[in-house]
Design a protein with these regions (language model features):
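Structured interface patches
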Residues: 1-196
């Protein structure tokens, strides 16, 4: 037998709200491109979610992806999973979004870079890659001015202290003299470690 004498009972229940959240993309500028010269489309444009009022009041959008603009030349398309925290419920039933990005007003050109240097080591090394074909992106009035003299390839060997033999090492490409230009893609340089 259970008995009690209560004047008041306190029950705490979370208040849930529904909200349409636009889906967006975070852009990392690079190779002459910024969010100002990109057209971004996300499909669907938004989803409806439910969640605790205190959580949803702080959310105005959902970032579905972060895209490095130096990773592609003129267009990008990917299907991504819509990220939702455990405290939110997707009422739309759509779990993936398609992201399309177009770069406008910029042109690309191939430049053969021969200025290849290393940094981050005092070991004896030999750069086996003597030239590297680099794709450069910039506004039309700038692209024609860029030559091999402006393109510099730097290989950071800081993490290769105990390495021996020939190794393909990621390289960074710089376009000197043009702040609105840069290299597209990833590059590697073959480096031979000759001694200690």
């Amino acid at each position: 037998e259970i008995s009690g004498n209560y004047d008041t009972v306190s029950v705490s229940m979370p208040v849930l709200m529904n909200k349409d959240l636009p889906l967006t993309v975070s852009l990392v500028g690079g190779a002459g491109a910024t969010e100002d010269n990109c057209v971004v489309e996300v499909e669907p444009k938004s989803i409806q979610v439910a969640g605790d009022t205190t959580v949803l009041q702080k959310l105005n959008q959902l970032v579905v992806a972060t895209v490095d603009l130096s990773s592609f030349a003129t267009s990008y398309e990917a299907t991504v999973t819509i990220p939702l925290g455990n405290d939110l419920k997707n009422l739309s039933g759509v779990t993936e979004a398609t992201v399309r990005i177009s770069v406008r007003g910029l042109e690309t050109a191939k430049v053969t870079a021969t200025n290849i240097t290393t940094t981050g080591t005092n070991r004896r090394v030999e750069i086996m890659t003597t030239s590297l074909d680099v794709t450069v992106r910039a506004p039309a009035d700038t692209i024609s001015q860029i030559t091999a003299d402006n393109v510099r390839v730097v290989v950071d060997l800081t993490n290769y202290r105990a390495t021996s033999g020939t190794v393909a090492v990621p390289a960074k490409v710089y376009v000197d003299g043009f702040s609105n230009a840069g290299a597209i893609g990833e590059y590697v340089v073959n480096v031979h470690f000759t001694g200690g």
